[in-house]
């Protein structure tokens, strides 16, 4: 709480609306803070001795940590300290189902997380269907929704996001794919879809990049861990092809096929119909060409990888070799209205995962590369926290993404999931004094028992000035279901945050 004489501002604020309303009418309405600092008696401010005390008090509040004036309204905070700052923390795959080994509790309920619980006590909680009830989200569609974009309207495939996040400058007509380094045995059966979660893949990527085929240019790049991206560039190629990833072990990689069927009838004589059929035939021809290119590329990559010194050494150590590439998620670059243009706030992304960085980059947000951020359970969270605080100086909205909980969920590792939750909680106290609003949620559930994404809703908490608090005292899936926020969709989260920040626009007259 504010200390006297700072608390006098609450009884003397009746002088301020006159000044603020007049300042708002100026062309440079966002420069309120500069006007307060440079002008001891701002234009229109009442000529009363008490006014100077209010001004002095406002300056004292601006110099104080943000947590000390959390009881004030959002609009007043904006007036006193400048632009409102929001931090959205996304713990990838953090939500879970109850586990018998944990006395039918979830990892989030077992984890020691005093900071998340503190946010729940002073904020509003709820549960969220990132896409829709009963729909298990991919990480790509989930992050589109969490940034306020409708994935049903904007999603064109995972590949473009992976490529953009890997630093590849995509051109019109490029087709991008997500790739997994995987392990196959001598019978071409997939024994590990992630090649033992291999991390050092740069040498492998360099070898694969040397593959040349007629018909298209291949751009291959490793991203984080077992992940990579592949871009096809050239004429007459298509994203309308199937995946080679069987999405489970014990099966052979799938043959990539065109998704368009061969037309069985001859072209009709009617010009309009014939034109449509000819276009379909052309699309099908391009898809067939692309499928053949990808199958040939996969075969050549397998021959290169199984003989590579890195994999020979892994076999000697008893580790699964990264001797095959599973290709999936082909797509073209989507058109996204820039985040700042759409919502009126300047956004920044602090993440290691190429997918998340790519979504944010294509949305026009600033993307920060953090040394030590691995996109795994061993990521350097303190380095990420430092990057968040640095970017808060120049951005209104920061998205902090942490991948580790999802990885632990896919591996069925209860201990690792609890540990990463506790590590994320430990850095939250670094943000309390630098952000007005702090939001914590997950992009989807990755239950230990399923080892994959499910449609279970995820918990969300929003804490900050002016938020209607509820009776929830802890942060978990079970507790959040009783919260005042109710049950929302992923694409509703940003509009709710924007409204709390005082930047929403009225719908209607």
What role is predicted for each listed range?
Residues 1-2, 7-14, 37-39, 48, ...:
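Short, positively charged low-complexity motifs
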Residues 3, 20-22, 45, 59, ...:
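Serine/threonine-rich, low-complexity intrinsically disordered segments
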Residues 10, 18, 31, 69-70, ...:
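Short, positively charged and aromatic/hydrophobic N-terminal segments
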Residues 13, 19-22, 38, 44-46, ...:
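Extended rod-forming repeat segments used as scaffolds/tethers
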Residues 24-28:
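Polybasic, lysine-rich low-complexity intrinsically disordered segments
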Residues 75-509:
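Feature captures the catalytic ectodomains and active-site-proximal regions of enzymes
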């Amino acid at each position: 709480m504010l200390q006297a004489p700072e608390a006098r501002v609450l009884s003397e604020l009746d002088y301020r609306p006159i000044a603020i309303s007049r300042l708002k009418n100026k062309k440079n309405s966002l420069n309120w803070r500069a006007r307060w600092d440079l002008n001891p008696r701002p234009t229109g401010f009442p000529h009363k001795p008490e006014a100077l005390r209010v001004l002095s008090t406002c300056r004292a509040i601006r110099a104080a940590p943000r947590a000390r004036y959390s009881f004030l309204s959002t609009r007043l905070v904006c007036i006193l300290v400048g632009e409102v700052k929001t931090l959205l923390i996304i713990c990838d795959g953090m939500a879970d189902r109850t586990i018998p080994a944990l006395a039918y509790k979830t990892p989030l309920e077992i984890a020691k997380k005093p900071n998340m619980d503190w946010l729940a006590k002073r904020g509003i909680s709820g549960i969220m269907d990132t896409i829709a009830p009963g729909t298990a989200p991919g990480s790509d569609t989930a992050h589109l929704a969490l940034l306020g974009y409708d994935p049903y309207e904007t999603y064109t495939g995972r590949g473009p996001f992976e490529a953009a996040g890997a630093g590849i400058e995509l051109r019109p007509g490029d087709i991008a794919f997500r790739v997994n380094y995987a392990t196959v045995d001598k019978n071409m059966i997939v024994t590990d879809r992630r090649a033992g979660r291999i991390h050092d893949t740069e040498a492998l990527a360099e070898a694969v990049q040397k593959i040349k085929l007629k018909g298209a240019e291949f751009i291959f790049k490793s991203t984080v861990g077992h992940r990579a991206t592949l871009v096809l560039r050239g004429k007459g190629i298509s994203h309308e092809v199937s995946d080679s990833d069987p999405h489970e072990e014990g099966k052979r990689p799938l043959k990539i096929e065109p998704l368009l069927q061969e037309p069985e009838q001859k072209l009709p004589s009617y010009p309009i119909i014939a034109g449509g059929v000819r276009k379909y035939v052309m699309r099908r021809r391009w898809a067939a060409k692309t499928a053949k290119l990808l199958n040939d590329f996969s075969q050549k990559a397998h021959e290169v990888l199984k003989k590579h010194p890195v994999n020979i050494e892994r076999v000697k150590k008893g580790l699964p070799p990264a001797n095959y590439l599973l290709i999936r998620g082909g797509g073209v670059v989507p058109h996204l209205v820039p985040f700042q243009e759409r919502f009126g706030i300047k956004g920044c992304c602090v993440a290691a995962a190429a997918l998340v960085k790519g979504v944010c980059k294509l949305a026009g947000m600033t993307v920060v590369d953090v040394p030590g951020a691995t996109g795994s359970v061993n990521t350097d969270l303190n380095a990420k926290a430092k990057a968040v605080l640095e970017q808060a100086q120049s951005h209104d909205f920061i998205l902090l993404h942490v991948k580790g909980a999802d990885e632990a969920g896919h591996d069925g590792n209860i201990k690792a999931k609890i540990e990463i939750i506790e590590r994320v909680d430990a850095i939250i106290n670094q943000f309390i004094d630098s952000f007005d609003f702090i939001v914590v949620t997950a992009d989807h559930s990755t239950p230990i028992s399923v080892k994959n994404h499910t449609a279970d809703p995820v918990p969300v908490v929003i804490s900050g000035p002016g938020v209607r608090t509820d009776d929830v005292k802890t942060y978990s899936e079970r507790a959040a279901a009783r919260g005042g926020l109710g049950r929302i969709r992923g694409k509703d989260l940003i509009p709710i945050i924007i409204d709390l920040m005082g930047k929403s626009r009225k719908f209607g007259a």
